[in-house]
Amino acid sequence: FEKWKASAARREIVAFVTRLNNSCVNKPNLTIDAAPPQVRKLMDALRQIAKGCDQYLPKPGEARRYGSPMFRDWHAWLVSSTPGLVSSLGADNAELSARLAASFGDRTRIDYGTGHECAFVVFLLGCFKLQLITDGDVDSGAVVCGCFAEYVRTCRIIQRCFGLEPAGSKGVWALDDYQLLPFLFGCSQLSDEEHGFGDEDTGLLTVNASALAQRSMFYECLAFVDESTGSTPLDVAAPILFNLTMQPWRTNARRLLRLFDEEVLGQKPVVQHMLFGELLRADWDVSEGPSEESERLARMKAVMDAANRKLGIGS
């Protein structure tokens, strides 16, 4: 893990997230019709992933302690579908397919967290390296304001549909139970706007977050948290999030970028599940420890093959 913390792979992810963050300064969320062609393809693929939930809806009244077991069936469908979705983007790349399949939760634990969110960032980085998205797509803000915003909406649909458990949730001491990066990008989208969304005395919101959701991913996430916490004042339900109301948006963005580096990329329980391969290399001597990257890719291929057999594909 110490080798990972000092690795070029970690620096590459931080640099890419920083570039994405800089690209969306003062830019609203992008509709699919306004997106450039390749970003539109990505957004359409994400919508197909969300629509796939309709085939695996949890049974009414099903007995469950945590998330719905139907998530496992949906995830098998996802794994079998990602090669076709990636092919529709213009590439036949097993590693890219595996990274996309790893971006929506863990089928064994039926949970979702910032590690899965990070997997999607690395998927986008892979798309960039394979020239499926261009410098212009990235630096115009289209990848963040279009594709990443669509990814967050897709994740919310999946989280609600299957009742996914938060992976490594810190409860009230987190921004929300699942996401981090849409708060970062959302703050940058609001960079030059007057800060403040809550009343420090009452702990209540002073904005209609749902009405502002198209303006910024931050408000979209704020609306989700407000809906999830019910009548509990935000300063009680999510004090870390509420504290952001007191600082300018640019200050919040800097803090959240540092938080991503420290609390996502800097945490072994998160990054131990990261896939390594041609698109994100382990730049340390793997002979000094277990060769996890090849084993993970082999396991992912085995899961894909099993899912295909279950669905009668290629049999």
Q: Where are the regions that the model predicts?
A:
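Glycine- and acidic-residue-rich phosphate-binding/metal-coordinating active-site segment common to enzymes
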Residues: 123, 130-175
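Well-ordered alpha-helical scaffold segments within catalytic/enzyme domains
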Residues: 123-134, 183-193
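N-terminal leader regions that mediate targeting or early regulatory function
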Residues: 1-103, 107-117, 141, 145-149, ...
